[in-house]
UniProtKB/Swiss-Prot annotation:
The keyword Disulfide bond does not apply. One of its GO terms (cellular component) is ribonucleoprotein complex. NCBIfam families: PRK00596.1 (NF001861), rpsJ_bact (TIGR01049). Part of the 30S ribosomal subunit. Coiled coil: none annotated. This is Small ribosomal subunit protein uS10.
Amino acid sequence: MQNQRIRIRLKGFDHRLIDQSTAEIVETAKRTGAQVRGPIPLPTRKERFTVLISPHVNKDARDQYEIRTHKRLVDIVEPTEKTVDALMRLDLAAGVDVQISLG
């Protein structure tokens, strides 16, 4: 796997789970002899929702909610076969979305 790169993007609502999963990925890659760049924190997406509390009148009575989507990026440069095999066997938290691309 010469001159290749694995780019891993992690997304989730809980930043602690993302940081924990990122640490597991980095530790696994370094243990198998690959060079790691990252974790790089990407901008957090904040979605805000405003909901009327009252069913009929009182437009002033509102609640506001927010969902934050945290993202991290990890690049693994020149991965070995052991690195790819170890990453495939890695079991990450359920609240983390993982996207892997080869480049």
